[in-house]
Amino acid sequence: MKTAVWAACLLLLASALPPAADAARRPHRVARHAAHQPVQPAAAPQPLHVTIMDGDSGAILHCEDCNAPMPPASMSKLMTALIVGDALLQHRITLDTRYHVSENAWRHGAMSDGSHMFLELNSEVSIRDLIQGVIVVSANDACIVLAEGLAGSESAFVALMNRRAQELGLRSAHFTNATGLPDPNHVISSADLARLARYLVANHPELYRLYGERAFTYNGHTQENRNPLLGTVAGADGLKTGHTDDSGFGLVGSAVQNGHRRILVFNGLRSMADRREAGINLMRAAFEQYATQRIARRGQQLGEAQVYLGSRATAPLVAQNDIVVGGPQAVLAGLRTHVVYAGPLRAPIAQGQVVAQLVVEGPGLQTKRFPLVSGQRIGGANWFAKAWEGLRVTFSGAH
């Protein structure tokens, strides 16, 4: 059953057919209809693994199987670009650094059936051109050249990708190559792709501007950016498309409207036309139908917890981080919050120690829990207070 929000944001397509080339690669079963039965209109494209994220706070606004690992195809090139961006920030390379196009990169990139930027065997190419090739036209040959140049081999570069994914907390991610070419162990969830995209936007502005470029010319060949949001959705400025027979057509998209950023990820569509339709409608819905609500700021006190045998009787409970909840606008109007902890707390308690949770719930919203910490250090009670407490417990329990 499709969710109500999906039905609300997509229009029915009367006669959308996949391009002939795609149909040839991906044969599909055609239903047989009796002569007197009318053919029903084609359903609107239904993507898989949908994530809509608030790019400002990182709050997930909408999730459809968004935490399940999936084959990302070329969308995983976001991590390839991030590794290059890190090296630039660390001054290990510059945009003018040149890398050699090996036979391996040429044969498995430029001579492959996948996307490439027409690199020539044994040529020397600048990082500036290579990273544009990766970001704008999804060039596999550029990915391999960068991997070999930065790490010595693609396998060593993949180790850097996986290590970086762990550092960023992308728990679903496991990469086996720098290109996104099919491999059953090359996976990441759409939610983690959204987190990766958000990190790129915030920490690599010098590279992020390339994601909005509409075309790239190299070696006499001009290729267009395949991102269907660019030029069609107001404020769209990135990020990356992906497609293999295993993954279908997917998109990591981002746009800014009225000072607010939304990040969209989905996968599993059968054609570029379907990807365009779904991408435009979902991104528009992301701004029109979803919102965020700030519950508390980092360090804000939200309650107190009883303390047993402490230097004070209660511990102030404060938000460990900003607490922001996102979702459909109608759902946010009915939010409820309450504090839970296993009490009384036992001293000593360190300042910043997680001791409780703020529970946020409401009709139509999956219950969310956020850590609360002690706002100050609380030492143990002195011997007199402990003795007095012992006497109190003893006599209060006597009959």
Per-range role (PLM):
Residues 24-194, 198-203:
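Active-site-adjacent loops and short helices of periplasmic peptidoglycan-processing enzymes
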Residues 6, 42-48, 245-249:
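Short, flexible loop/turn motifs enriched in small residues
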Residues 170-174, 182-187, 191-399:
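Domain-terminus/edge residues, biased toward the C-terminal soluble/receptor-binding domains
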Residues 23-44, 328, 380, 384-391, ...:
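Compositionally biased, proline/threonine/alanine/serine-rich low-complexity intrinsically disordered stretches
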